[in-house]
Amino acid sequence: MATEEKKPETEASKTQSTPSSSNNQSKPAPVKPNYTLKFTLAGHTKAVSSVKFSPNGEWLASSSADKLIKIWGAYDGKFEKTISGHKLGISDVAWSSDSNLLVSASDDKTLKIWDVSSGKCLKTLKGHSNYVFCCNFNPQSNLIVSGSFDESVRIWDVKTGKCLKTLPAHSDPVSAVHFNRDGSLIVSSSYDGLCRIWDTASGQCLKTLIDDDNPPVSFVKFSPNGKYILAATLDNTLKLWDYSKGKCLKTYTCHKNEKYCIFANFSVTGGKWIVSGSEDNLVYIWNLQTKEVVQKLQGHTDVVISTACHPTENIIASAALENDKTIKLWKSDC
């Protein structure tokens, strides 16, 4: 169920987007976004674990400790369907590039590939010996990568559901896995304090990113252009790395993250922002370049575990843990 936030329209907001201003391609980057709450999506009965917008921008998928996946309208928050089949809670969900398939990672030690339109399970991926915590499709969507509490990263064939490679990736649970833009590389992160870059084809480790300190790495992903890596560590820090140089370029702080694996994002539809949830129940938005906190979104009543940025519009989805159980959709003019 989506509840809509109604706000009186001010004169200022009416006059902001004149045709001349929106068509002017050389306008300077916005200083700050103005995200406001539009919808609250209720339906999950336990903590929400992950939210992801479909690549075509139409849908939002959510996963939860309640063992369910739910699909919602990306623009209006309207509940579409529930997809069920896992025996235990789900930690992550991800879309195929054509927005037709989902993959989910569960505590039941399996991943499942789902046909979204029918809600049917097409394949169950078995092989991990402990909770599966994270998953993603490659851009071609013929492969899936997964990370588990069994400390391994696995690469799966989508068509057959067979495991193609098992990478002895880490010495602690794997917190995140992500393909780069052409699918040639995988990045993984772990509680062992390491981020590793893998060659998809050979399964070889090409690089290990190590900082002076090595707090658990709770999340990692490639930037949209594939040149950088955004990594979260459980010392209240997000870092932007140039991975080819193995160099940390930017550090983002002020949020709280010491316990949970909280997703972070690049927001590129308007200004260039970094977006993350936080253990103080807020969504934080930083200016990517200046590293300053430009907005904090208030409304959740528990840890904001997951955020997602819409592929084409200035829309953020956020999701929170057990004391909240809701998903919120926020929109901005820039």
Swiss-Prot record:
<dbReference type="InterPro" id="IPR001680">
    <property type="entry name" value="WD40_rpt"/>
</dbReference>
<dbReference type="GO" id="GO:0000123">
    <property type="term" value="C:histone acetyltransferase complex"/>
</dbReference>
<feature type="repeat" description="WD 5">
    <location>
        <begin position="212"/>
        <end position="253"/>
    </location>
</feature>
<feature type="repeat" description="WD 7">
    <location>
        <begin position="299"/>
        <end position="333"/>
    </location>
</feature>
<comment type="subunit">
    <text>Interacts with HCFC1. Probable component of complexes involved in histone modification such as the MLL1/MLL complex and the NSL complex.</text>
</comment>
<feature type="repeat" description="WD 2">
    <location>
        <begin position="85"/>
        <end position="126"/>
    </location>
</feature>
<dbReference type="GO" id="GO:0006325">
    <property type="term" value="P:chromatin organization"/>
</dbReference>
<dbReference type="GO" id="GO:0071339">
    <property type="term" value="C:MLL1 complex"/>
</dbReference>
<dbReference type="InterPro" id="IPR036322">
    <property type="entry name" value="WD40_repeat_dom_sf"/>
</dbReference>
<keyword id="KW-0539">Nucleus</keyword>
<feature type="compositionally biased region" description="Basic and acidic residues">
    <location>
        <begin position="1"/>
        <end position="12"/>
    </location>
</feature>
<dbReference type="Pfam" id="PF25175">
    <property type="entry name" value="Beta-prop_WDR5"/>
</dbReference>
<feature type="repeat" description="WD 4">
    <location>
        <begin position="169"/>
        <end position="208"/>
    </location>
</feature>
<feature type="compositionally biased region" description="Low complexity">
    <location>
        <begin position="13"/>
        <end position="28"/>
    </location>
</feature>
<protein>
    <recommendedName>
        <fullName>WD repeat-containing protein 5</fullName>
    </recommendedName>
</protein>
<feature type="repeat" description="WD 1">
    <location>
        <begin position="43"/>
        <end position="82"/>
    </location>
</feature>
<comment type="similarity">
    <text>Belongs to the WD repeat WDR5/wds family.</text>
</comment>
<keyword id="KW-0853">WD repeat</keyword>
<comment type="function">
    <text>Contributes to histone modification. May position the N-terminus of histone H3 for efficient trimethylation at 'Lys-4'. As part of the MLL1/MLL complex it is involved in methylation and dimethylation at 'Lys-4' of histone H3. H3 'Lys-4' methylation represents a specific tag for epigenetic transcriptional activation. As part of the NSL complex it may be involved in acetylation of nucleosomal histone H4 on several lysine residues. May regulate osteoblasts differentiation.</text>
</comment>
<dbReference type="InterPro" id="IPR020472">
    <property type="entry name" value="G-protein_beta_WD-40_rep"/>
</dbReference>
<dbReference type="InterPro" id="IPR019775">
    <property type="entry name" value="WD40_repeat_CS"/>
</dbReference>
<feature type="region of interest" description="Disordered">
    <location>
        <begin position="1"/>
        <end position="32"/>
    </location>
</feature>
<dbReference type="InterPro" id="IPR015943">
    <property type="entry name" value="WD40/YVTN_repeat-like_dom_sf"/>
</dbReference>
<feature type="repeat" description="WD 6">
    <location>
        <begin position="256"/>
        <end position="296"/>
    </location>
</feature>
<keyword id="KW-0677">Repeat</keyword>
<keyword id="KW-0805">Transcription regulation</keyword>
<keyword id="KW-0156">Chromatin regulator</keyword>
<keyword id="KW-0804">Transcription</keyword>
<feature type="repeat" description="WD 3">
    <location>
        <begin position="128"/>
        <end position="168"/>
    </location>
</feature>
